[in-house]
């Protein structure tokens, strides 16, 4: 399944707020909610499916990518669900987003693809690049990219940057301090349901 490129508002109306996908908030009429949920028993499969879809759309990844992350998380020591979230959160495109350098993850991915981002002084054009503690994230010395990021930073710095990241406005430099903990996830998600969804595939 390819990466979603359709209307974003339609997705958040169904799944709820997904800040990585869009900074818009879902607005549902109470009547539509009642019509869709009244007298209907939601199956456990649907609940798990929707939690899985939240991860897919929020982080902007394909079905195959998410399944691969689940498989990696299963092989690692510790809580599979928490490790899965850590893997997704440490993606370069997500780190750029969480630093406030872009308003969405698709915007961050575009910066990476266009070779505007450096990690430890080297250009990295792979959005899925897995960041590590002590990695420095900077931008190329180009007026256009600096102007875009500076504008975003001024607006999004009012939102709290998670504790595992630090951003220096003076140096225009982001730092990965450590692997994040569960409390720093910027998404309302039950990751255990996602793991259960893939229990027969991973």
UniProtKB/Swiss-Prot annotation:
Its main location: plastid. One of its GO terms (cellular component) is small ribosomal subunit. It is found in: Plastid, Chloroplast. InterPro entries: Ribosomal_uS4 (IPR022801), Ribosomal_uS4_bac-type (IPR005709), Ribosomal_uS4_CS (IPR018079), Ribosomal_uS4_N (IPR001912), S4_RNA-bd (IPR002942), S4_RNA-bd_sf (IPR036986). Residues 90-153 form the S4 RNA-binding domain. Belongs to the universal ribosomal protein uS4 family. PANTHER family: 30S 40S RIBOSOMAL PROTEIN, SMALL RIBOSOMAL SUBUNIT PROTEIN US4M. This is Small ribosomal subunit protein uS4c. It comes from Hypopterygium laricinum.
């Amino acid at each position: 399944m390819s990466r979603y490129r359709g209307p974003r508002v339609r997705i958040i109306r169904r799944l709820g707020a997904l800040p990585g996908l869009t900074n818009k908030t879902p607005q549902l009429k109470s009547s539509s909610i009642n019509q869709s949920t009244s007298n209907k028993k939601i199956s456990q499969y649907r609940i798990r499916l929707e939690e899985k879809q939240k991860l897919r759309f929020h982080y902007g990844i394909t079905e195959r990518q998410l399944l691969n992350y689940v498989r990696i998380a299963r092989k690692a020591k510790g809580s599979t669900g928490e490790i899965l979230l850590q893997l997704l959160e440490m993606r370069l495109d997500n780190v750029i987003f969480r630093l406030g350098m872009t308003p969405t993850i698709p915007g961050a991915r575009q910066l990476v693809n266009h070779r505007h981002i450096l990690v430890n002084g080297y250009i990295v054009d792979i959005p899925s690049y897995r960041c590590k503690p002590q990695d420095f994230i900077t931008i190329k010395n180009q007026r256009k990219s600096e102007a875009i990021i500076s504008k975003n930073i001024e607006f999004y710095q009012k939102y709290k940057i998670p504790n595992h990241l630090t951003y220096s406005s003076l140096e225009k430099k982001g730092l990965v301090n450590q692997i994040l903990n569960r409390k720093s996830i910027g998404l309302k998600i039950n990751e255990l349901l996602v793991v259960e969804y893939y229990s027969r595939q991973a």
